[in-house]
Amino acid sequence: GGQGMRIAINRDEVAEYVQNILDLFPGNQILLDRFLEDAVEIDVDSVCDGDEVWLTGIMQHIEPAGVHSGDSTAVLPPFSLSDEVQATIRRYVEDIADALDAKGLLNVQMVVKDNVVYVIEANPRASRTVPFVAKASGIPIPSIATKVMLGEKLATFREQGMLESDLEGYAIKEPVFSWDKFPEVPKELGPEMKSTGEAIAFVDALTDDHFQRPFEM
């Protein structure tokens, strides 16, 4: 859930955070990543069978990168990514799946800054977004992924028409927060996850309040 992660905006903050960590956990390993300000975060779920990679969905976050993906509002399909960027995302996922020799579900988190795609992390497992994409698309993704892990090929499911999404318009994953149950928790969103659940909304157009609301917060 992003526990222990911090965003530092200058060298002094980096030094302060590092010292605080070392004071609490002497000898602890620390990972420093470059933070891309005002970047767009992307979640990609896919299923790999060793021969091909099926991208079940590319989700674009409304909140800027830096907010934990579990606390972000995600839109399926993406609403402002160019065809070129989406093609790059697809190629990166395929290359990662091949390098990892992935079989079954693979989640890749990325950010896009100035039309350049960066990979944050790749997880060869089910992610929290799989149920969202499955419900949004009407495709039994967990079942298909399980059968693929047991040896079946994606081509079999494609021939049966099982990989075709029936989503019309957009599906929006909205985080649910239980601030009333945890009043002591700061309400500012950041790299540590604070949501306790998720809801899904289906909209026909991006003028819908479900899409516009996060921009107004």
Residue ranges and their predicted role:
Residues G1-M217:
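ATP-dependent carboxylate activation and anion-phosphoryl transfer catalytic cores
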